[in-house]
Design a protein with these regions (language model features):
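Sec-dependent bacterial lipoprotein signal peptides
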Residues: 1-4
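Bacterial signal peptide processing site
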Residues: 6-10
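Extracytoplasmic/secreted cell-surface and envelope-processing proteins
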Residues: 11-13, 37-44, 77-81, 132-142, ...
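Von Willebrand factor
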Residues: 22-128, 132-133, 165-168, 172
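Well-ordered, non-membrane alpha-helical segments in soluble/globular domains
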Residues: 45-56, 93-112, 137-157
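A charged, solvent-exposed segment within the mature domains of Sec-exported extracytoplasmic proteins
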Residues: 114-188
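Eukaryote-biased recognition of electropositive, low-complexity segments
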Residues: 162-233
């Protein structure tokens, strides 16, 4: 399957073996967890999301030069503690206290902020439920705008980093909290399974190195569902 980008460039989506050369570069690893209200339910006791992020980022950090931890909603909020504390202190209360707009978020804007912070030697990890904040009326029109906003953010990232690769891992986790419907309704869900996504951005050659050292199938014990990869070809 292929998607067309600006200028007719193709973004290939598939499960082919990665043929990119493996880089020896030790990247700067930037981690972002969305801390808007829709993510609160994943912060319950026994959350597979917290275990997955702790395990995956711990393994990636071994291959990285430095690791920075952040929350993100309408702005990037740096976290100054250790990875273990970052995970242990994740609760709806700490999410709200961290700052920013806790009530809603814009996926396209978050991706844009993340990509603007990147260099050719950095890798960014973004964890989100990827729920689009659409109005009750004219939702289809706003959905199209969201899609364009996401596409523009990725294309701007590719202009900055020509060999930018994107991987999206689908995960599931226990969820115990409020679920916000597109029509404005709210339902309290109790210990159901809900999907969320781990986005990985970086130079294709660096991603090839990380994938060889930390295969994503190691997440199978934490709710791994599948992965798609996008790269310029």
């Amino acid at each position: 399957t292929s998607l067309l980008g600006c200028g007719g460039d193709k973004i290939i989506v598939g499960s082919e073996t990665n043929t990119n050369p493996i880089s020896n570069q030790r990247p700067v690893l930037n981690v972002y967890i969305e801390n808007s209200g829709s993510m609160d339910g994943y912060m319950c006791d026994g959350s597979q999301l917290k275990d997955a992020v702790f395990d995956y980022v711990s393994d990636l950090s071994v291959c990285s030069d430095t690791t920075s931890l952040n929350y993100i909603n309408n702005r990037i909020i740096p976290y100054k503690g250790s990875l273990e504390q970052y995970i242990k202190t994740m609760t709806p209360t700490t999410f709200q206290k961290a700052g920013g707009n806790h009530s809603n978020s814009d996926l396209g804007e978050m991706l844009k902020m993340i990509l603007q912070e990147m260099t050719d030697t950095s890798v960014s990890i973004f964890i989100s439920d990827c729920i689009l904040d659409l109005p009750v009326s004219n939702s289809q029109k706003f959905l199209s705008r969201c899609q364009i906003s996401i596409k523009n953010a990725i294309n701007e990232g590719r202009n900055k980093i020509p060999d930018l690769g994107v991987e999206i891992i689908k995960m599931t986790s226990d969820f115990n909290g409020k679920y916000y419907y597109p029509n404005g309704g709210i339902e309290k869900l109790k210990y159901v399974k809900r999907p969320y996504y781990i986005w990985i951005f970086g130079n294709n050659n660096i991603l090839a190195k990380l994938n060889s050292v930390v295969p994503v199938n190691e997440l199978k014990d934490f709710g791994f569902e599948g992965i798609v990869a996008y790269s310029k070809k």
